[in-house]
Every structure is written in structure tokens, then in C-alpha cells.
Swiss-Prot record:
Localization (cell): Secreted; Target cell membrane
GO MF assignments: toxin activity
Tissue localization of expression: Expressed by the venom gland.
Predominant localisation class: secreted
Descriptive protein name: Venom peptide 6
Annotated family: Belongs to the MCD family.
Signal peptide: 1-26
A Gene Ontology cellular-component term: membrane
Residue positions assigned to the propeptide: 27-46
Each AXPX repeat, start to end: 26-29, 30-33, 40-43
GO BP terms, alphabetized: defense response to bacterium; defense response to fungus; innate immune response; killing of cells of another organism
Keywords of the record: Antibiotic, Antimicrobial, Cytolysis, Fungicide, Immunity, Innate immunity, Membrane, Repeat, Secreted, Signal, Target cell membrane, Target membrane, Toxin
Length: 62
């Protein structure tokens, strides 16, 4: 049971890291004057439920 909880904990951390990387800029287009692409940063409040779930799992391990 504890190995499953540890796996879920690290999977959640990996998912959060992937969500933070989704705000990268797109590759420049082939046109001579490419328009700049705005970076879409994820909202930090969206991670609240995920952080609560991960902290609950971590507390159950201790």
C-alpha cells in the first residue's frame, strides 16, 4: 500500500511539472516577420486541489 501511495505522489508531482511546461512559446513560423506569441502561464490557484491531494497522501504515509 505504501509503495502505491509513493507512486501516486511522484506521479502527481510529474503531472504538475508537465502542466507548468505547457506555457512554452510556439516555434517561430517560416514567415519573415513572425508575430510574437504570448506565453500562457497556468493559473497557480488551479493547482490547489492537486496540492491538497498530494499533501493528504503524504500525511497518510507518515
Amino acid at each position: 500500500m505504501k509503495s502505491t501511495s509513493v507512486f501516486i505522489l511522484f506521479a502527481g508531482i510529474a503531472i504538475m511539472a508537465c502542466l507548468q511546461m505547457t506555457g512554452t512559446e510556439a516555434a517561430p513560423s517560416a514567415s519573415p516577420n513572425p508575430t510574437p506569441v504570448a506565453r500562457a502561464d497556468p493559473d497557480p490557484e488551479a493547482f490547489g486541489p492537486v496540492i491538497g491531494l498530494l499533501s493528504g497522501i503524504l500525511k497518510s504515509l507518515l
